[in-house]
Amino acid sequence: SFENGLEGWTRVEYANGSKTLLEVVDGEGVNDSKALKIQQLPENDKCCVGVKRTLTDLEPDQMYRMTARIRYSDIPNGQGTGPVIFRPNSKQYWNSSRYLYGTELKNWTNVTVDFMADDNGEAEIVAALGFWQGGMANGGRSTGTAYFDNISVVKVTDELFTLESEYMRIFIEPSKVNISVQVLQQWLKNLDKIYLSYLELMGEVPHEGRKLAIQTTKGIYSGYWALAGYPILWTANGTAVEDSFSQMLQHDDWCFGILHEIGHVFNIGDTSWNWNDEMFANFRMHYALEKNNGKVYMDGRNGKQVFTGGEILDMYKIDYENTIGTKVNDNGIHYMLARMAASITWEPYKKTFNYLRKNGGSGTNKYDKFVHFVNTLNRFAKETNPDVDVWDYFSALELESIKKQLN
């Protein structure tokens, strides 16, 4: 509560806070108690302003739930996040409570956000109008008025559905779990295989080698299915989780979306060479699926189908065929880069990623980075076969189409 004013809290201005009203007011809290009020008028533009405090004596690497009660008014629909609570974290930028829009002053809205404590048993928490990160599709920042009260934090590791394997941990909202523990255990074993293959390809592991974590959250922008980081966020809005679990049961699906996000997590080291990690997250997955005979249930040439192992190349070939004649898309570039593996093997790719991870890229635009990548791959391919030239795998039409996409 805020009965003692802002004792223990500190005002924080992430964006445009010079004209933001932030105060503790009487009679606006639960049962007419005191509440934190934050107000940003539309004429002063969108903001992210709130209060923060650092929690101590938490259990390291355990899941905690921050809860607050909020009333709000005049929050433009779809503008930023509205009033939210969150834990600012450089390893996972995007986690927050669910977004609130419009006006609801008569009743209190309960919101929650789950987060992991740091290794030192600390965590910074924030209650704010608007979100600390502006680089999201809705802009992050907001205007309007919000009242916060009854902020609390409790450990919830045991309240979530939790399961772990050698390299993975999942923290899932229990109502989302619609398949057996045995099926999920097998999935985590499959993710362990993927993890080791990503390590083979990239030459290093992320997050100091700790187990990667996946957690469900309602505080995720509606356009996002999941977001990479530590932990990986998986939307609890809608039925994304349940649908994925059902596909695991029906099709032995390893879950393309989660494999993609883990692929992002392995974008490590000097990443200046990387012109598009949406593509390279899938490229890492491609290698891992081929090496482990993994399965994903995705759109094929005649509707949904299971792609097993190296069959995944054909999924990317579909886009290649549909776009190569004009401006090839990223999936088409993926196809062209991956098709050579059947001839030159994956070893030059491993050496290429390991080299680039340590040394970075060359060139200021995307096409220059593409050229640097292929030249590096070519250099390592020649170590095995001096007669090979990977540029020979690209036609003039293909290179022209790639230029149109990357310039």
Where are these regions (language model features)?
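Zinc-dependent metallopeptidase catalytic helix centered on the HExxH motif
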Residues: 242-308
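Non-catalytic terminal regions of proteins
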Residues: 405-407
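Juxtacatalytic substrate-recognition/specificity segment
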Residues: 162-259
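Loop/turn elements at helix/coil->beta-strand transitions in domains of secreted/extracellular proteins
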Residues: 166-168, 204-213, 261-264, 289-294, ...
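Surface-exposed patches in mature extracellular/periplasmic domains of secreted proteins
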Residues: 201-215, 269-274, 296-300, 349-355, ...
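Active-site-proximal alpha-helical
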Residues: 198, 307-402
